[in-house]
């Protein structure tokens, strides 16, 4: 077998005909400037080809269910294994996906509760035992005389298949009727059922009317049904709603309450299967409701000023709604100018929930006409509820949904499962009790479980427990011990979700695989980094090739082999500058990475720390998530860094509490903040901006030029050119989103999508405009010999130079270059930008606005995806914002950023329930001397003179 992955002539994106041999079964780190071609080589070439070859080897039927990768632009690659990529982007937003389901821990837990759990009656608290036929007969005979019922044998429950053969056998045995998926049929008239879908089939054993002397026949029919369905029978009312259906089981039933569990199988504990999901919330554990805090986000506003957000969306507010409110004000005698919070509770309730049948004269005017209608007032919330149910429009449904929050389901109280599943206990815990635990307590629960089980139970549980304990151990090892097992995947950060998938990959125990990882150290404190690196080494030692795109210094130093890409970014990158051991990189004079590793270049500690403008922003009594009544002060006019181990409460304090509270007050945002007692100092600010890593646009039509507003200036500039004016072209002519100037063959996309079925969709360059997006006439308008299509194809650096004489465009381009994005194309599709790049495009947009010196900027891990040199440039930009009088709060683990901050707030001491306290606050020097601060421990050596 080949000992290397041999790549020849890789030209994907900006790669310059790269040829390299990468050792197999080693830990290989790819590093280099942001945009230098690391991901193009690791993901778009090596992973894409490995995955493509594997999928291509499958049958055409299997291929249609798998995403096919495009063939990368490379001459040839040898020595590839099946490839698995673990990226940050693929966090599932599915509300049914949890930490336990993603890691497969929940699958093993379901098996454990099904095989070892003991059902207890909710009524008596005693274990449930088998039911006798006599007890079943007594329960049916207790129905009112004359009740008509069907006695059913559930022979198929939630299984796929056609069941033709079985139907013939049932008919042969003397049965004439079936119920298939809730509908009754004669067996000979039963429809052909779809073998690819799950079905419920019950045989009708008997049809009865309750009367005296029926006991013998009923007992015989019950015995037949139980025998046919493996110990289960159903009594179903023939007249709908006359009585509740009864489920009988020879196995588990409470003699007092009649509470019955049909079967204890793993699917009973699945909240994604109808057999296990709570019927009230369909297994989601929560139900949406209209939240008054979202409907009236700012209680200081009056009704006239738009306190009711759903009715104040338009400017000016809709006259129809204002006339309704005026009628209510006349009838109930209150003023529309009174702030919402000062209105009596009765008035607030009438406005929100309606007049409860009380008829109110509602006066409307249309032009010169005035008319009055007397009717009960529906109420804002009732109006939204009705519209949500009756509308067919997805956009209206989405718009109304913005006023909803989720509350725990009233039936299962957030447990997601039906009562039968929650009645099954192991060591006095149902399955939901354990999923509510965080990783560490859950690990402890399963480790001590064998002592609580009988010898027979231990024989069954041994292998299941081994799998659960191993997987929980991996989560603990990659620094995720603070996560609860029922935590929704959608609430995890990119770094957390990547490390969870990493833990499940190690759990799978595969070998001979190529793993490609994208910055697994994101969001990880230096303390946990060593454990992550041990995990990567373990993955390698299983016999896998581990390829990691990473900027972390420890990871680079620990690697078996390092590939340094460069020398610049974008068109200036795409070459391998150095490849070899970490020492080889350090010794290479051309390697920027080597220069930082060796100390030839460094991010310097500032000579002095800013003291700020003397004002401060203080939040008191914050208790969101795991925060323990935290009070924090941020000096304004400074660069503040919030630090702490993963899960210590940084995001809860800054994003969930401080930002949401400030955004509601300063920006009028419709957000719900975490609980806190008070916030002071907002009067010193005029706005708060959260620059996060969410995409700048979700369609290929969105790009850096459209997002920053530069595209409007570019279109206006082209419209002013003599040729454009001679032809009568306005700025709209130069848009690729509307008819007129765009190429109609591809509708301004530049490419056409061809669906290939069993193969990946192919995007072919439009044969009319050849990818330019515009029609020929529009492209004939040129500035310095370049059309607008040529401008969109330029890099930001080239465009800044090209429009040197046009300040409105040049300044926006220069700002993008300043945040280190000089290499991206002006018209690059937003969907192709990484999270870090999207964040910096947002930063550039904010920087290009006129500075007020009273803005609070909040950034969450802005160094994601950044090389040492990129971090240095970013710090220059952030410090320039602070020098203008603004305040910056950054959540960060990167010690190069932390050491340059003016003020630190360190949370901890641990993650999850062990965190949520401020361990230290002050200058980096002060925090470095604080006992018990993990950040201080690592910071100390960074502050020592080299």
UniProtKB/Swiss-Prot annotation:
CDD domains, per the entry = ABC_UvrA_I (cd03270), ABC_UvrA_II (cd03271)
User: What cellular component GO annotations does this protein have?
Assistant: cytoplasm; excinuclease repair complex
What biological-process terms (Gene Ontology) are attached?
A: nucleotide-excision repair; SOS response
Q: Where does ATP bind?
A: 32-39, 644-651
Q: Which SUPFAM superfamilies match?
A: P-loop containing nucleoside triphosphate hydrolases (SSF52540)
Name the Gene3D superfamilies on file: ABC transporter ATPase domain-like, ABC transporter ATPase like domain, ATP-grasp fold, A domain, P-loop containing nucleotide triphosphate hydrolases
In this chain the ABC transporter domain maps to 311-592, 612-940
- Compartments in which it is found: Cytoplasm
Coarse class of the protein's main subcellular location: cytoplasm
Question: From the Swiss-Prot or TrEMBL record, what is one GO molecular function term?
Answer: ATP binding
Does the keyword field hold Cell division?
A: no
What are the residue ranges of zinc fingers typed C4-type? 743-769
What UniProt keywords are attached to this protein's entry? ATP-binding, Cytoplasm, DNA damage, DNA excision, DNA repair, DNA-binding, Excision nuclease, Metal-binding, Nucleotide-binding, Repeat, SOS response, Zinc, Zinc-finger
Pfam families xrefs: ABC_tran, UvrA_DNA-bind, UvrA_inter
HAMAP family the record matches: UvrA
NCBIfam families linked: PRK00349.1 (NF001503), uvra (TIGR00630)
Q: How does it assemble?
A: Forms a heterotetramer with UvrB during the search for lesions.
Name the protein family.
Belongs to the ABC transporter superfamily. UvrA family.
Per its database record, what is this protein's job? The UvrABC repair system catalyzes the recognition and processing of DNA lesions. UvrA is an ATPase and a DNA-binding protein. A damage recognition complex composed of 2 UvrA and 2 UvrB subunits scans DNA for abnormalities. When the presence of a lesion has been verified by UvrB, the UvrA molecules dissociate.
Quote the protein name from its UniProt record: UvrABC system protein A
């Amino acid at each position: 077998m080949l000992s290397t992955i041999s790549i020849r002539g890789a030209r994907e994106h900006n790669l310059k005909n790269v040829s390299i041999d990468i050792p197999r079964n080693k830990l290989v780190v790819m590093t280099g400037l942001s945009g230098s071609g690391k991901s193009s080589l690791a993901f778009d070439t090596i992973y894409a080809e490995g995955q493509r070859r594997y999928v291509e080897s499958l049958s055409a039927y299997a291929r249609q269910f798998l995403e096919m990768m495009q063939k990368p632009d490379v001459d040839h690659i040898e020595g590839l294994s099946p490839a698995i990529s673990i990226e940050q982007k693929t966090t599932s937003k599915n509300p049914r996906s949890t930490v336990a389901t993603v890691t497969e821990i929940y699958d093993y837990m379901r098996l454990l509760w099904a095989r070892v759990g003991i059902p207890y009656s909710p009524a008596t608290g005693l274990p449930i035992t088998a039911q006798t036929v006599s007890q079943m007969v007594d329960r049916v005979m207790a129905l009112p005389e004359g009740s008509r019922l069907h006695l059913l044998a559930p022979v198929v429950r939630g299984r796929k298949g056609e069941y033709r053969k079985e139907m013939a056998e049932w008919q042969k045995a003397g049965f004439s009727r079936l119920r298939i998926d809730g509908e009754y049929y004669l067996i000979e008239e039963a429809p052909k059922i779809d073998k690819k879908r799950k079905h419920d089939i019950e045989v009708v054993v008997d049809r009865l009317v309750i009367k005296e002397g029926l006991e013998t026949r009923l007992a015989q029919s019950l015995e037949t049904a139980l025998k046919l369905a493996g110990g289960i029978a159903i009594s179903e009312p023939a007249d709908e709603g006359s009585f509740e259906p009864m489920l009988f089981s020879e196995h588990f039933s409470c003699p007092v309450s009649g509470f019955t569990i049909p079967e204890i199988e793993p699917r009973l504990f699945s909240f994604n299967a109808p057999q296990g999901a709570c019927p009230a919330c369909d297994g989601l554990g929560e139900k949406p409701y209209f939240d008054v805090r979202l409907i009236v986000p700012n209680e200081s506003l009056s009704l006239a000023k738009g306190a009711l957000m759903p009715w104040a969306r338009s400017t000016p507010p809709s006259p129809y709604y204002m006339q309704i409110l005026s009628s209510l004000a006349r009838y109930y005698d209150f003023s529309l100018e009174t702030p919402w919070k000062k209105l009596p509770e009765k008035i607030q309730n009438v406005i929100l929930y309606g007049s409860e049948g009380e008829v109110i004269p509602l006066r409307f005017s249309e032009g010169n006409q005035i008319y009055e209608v007397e009717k009960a007032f529906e109420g804002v919330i009732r109006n939204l509820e009705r519209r949500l149910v009756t509308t067919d429009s997805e956009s209206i449904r989405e718009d109304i949904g913005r006023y909803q929050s989720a509350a725990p389901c009233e039936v299962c109280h957030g447990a997601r499962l039906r009562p039968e599943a929650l009645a099954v206990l192991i060591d006095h815990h149902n399955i939901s009790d354990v999923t509510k635990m965080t990783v560490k307590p859950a690990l402890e629960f399963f480790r001590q479980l064998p002592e609580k089980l009988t010898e027979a139970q231990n024989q069954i549980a041994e292998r299941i427990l081994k799998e659960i304990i191993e997987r929980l151990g991996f989560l603990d090892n990659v620094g995720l011990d603070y996560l609860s097992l029922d935590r929704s995947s959608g609430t995890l950060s990119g770094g957390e979700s990547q490390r969870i998938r990493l833990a499940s990959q190690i759990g799978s125990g595969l070998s001979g695989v190529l793993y490609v990882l994208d910055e697994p150290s994101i969001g990880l404190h230096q303390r946990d980094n060593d454990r992550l690196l041990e995990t990567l080494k373990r993955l390698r030692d299983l016999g896998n090739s581990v390829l990691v795109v990473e900027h972390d210094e420890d990871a680079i130093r620990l690697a078996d082999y390092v590939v340094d890409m460069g020398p610049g970014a974008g068109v200036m990158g795409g070459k391998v500058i150095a490849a070899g051991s970490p020492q080889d990189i350090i010794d290479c004079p051309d390697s920027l990475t080597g220069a930082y590793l060796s100390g030839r270049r460094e991010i310097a500690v500032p000579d002095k720390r800013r003291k700020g403008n003397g004002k401060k922003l203080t939040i008191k009594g914050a208790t969101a998530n795991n925060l323990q009544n935290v009070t924090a002060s941020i000096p304004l006019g400074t660069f503040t860094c919030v630090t702490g181990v993963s899960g210590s409460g940084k995001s809860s304090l800054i994003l969930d509490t401080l930002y949401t509270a400030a955004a509601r007050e300063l920006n009028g945002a419709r957000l719900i903040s975490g609980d806190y007692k008070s916030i002071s100092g907002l009067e010193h600010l005029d706005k708060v901006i959260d620059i996060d890593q969410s995409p700048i646009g979700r369609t290929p039509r969105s790009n850096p030029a459209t997002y920053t507003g530069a595209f409007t200036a570019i279109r206006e500039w082209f419209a002013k050119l003599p040729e454009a004016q001679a032809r009568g072209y306005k700025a709209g002519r130069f848009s690729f989103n509307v008819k007129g100037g765009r190429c109609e063959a591809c509708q301004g996309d530049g490419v056409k999508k061809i669906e290939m079925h069993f193969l990946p969709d192919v995007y072919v360059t439009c044969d009319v405009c050849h990818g330019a997006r515009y029609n020929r006439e529009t492209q004939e308008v040129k500035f310095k010999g370049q059309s607008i299509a040529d401008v969109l194809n330029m890099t930001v650096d080239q465009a800044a130079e090209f429009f040197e004489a046009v300040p409105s465009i040049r300044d926006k381009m220069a700002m993008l270059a300043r945040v280190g994005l000089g290499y991206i194309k002006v018209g690059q599709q937003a969907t192709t930008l990484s999270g870090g790049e999207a964040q910096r495009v947002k930063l550039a947009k904010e920087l290009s606005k006129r500075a007020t010196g009273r803005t609070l900027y909040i950034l969450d891990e802005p160094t994601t995806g950044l090389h040492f040199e990129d971090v240095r440039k970013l710090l220059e930009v952030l410090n320039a914002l602070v020098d203008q009088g603004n305040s910056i709060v950054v959540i960060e683990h990167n010690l190069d950023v932390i050491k340059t901050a003016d003020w630190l707030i360190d949370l901890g001491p641990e993650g999850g329930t062990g965190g949520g306290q401020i361990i230290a606050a002050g200058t980096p020097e002060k925090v470095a001397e604080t006992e018990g601060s993990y950040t201080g421990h690592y910071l100390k050596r960074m502050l020592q003179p080299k």
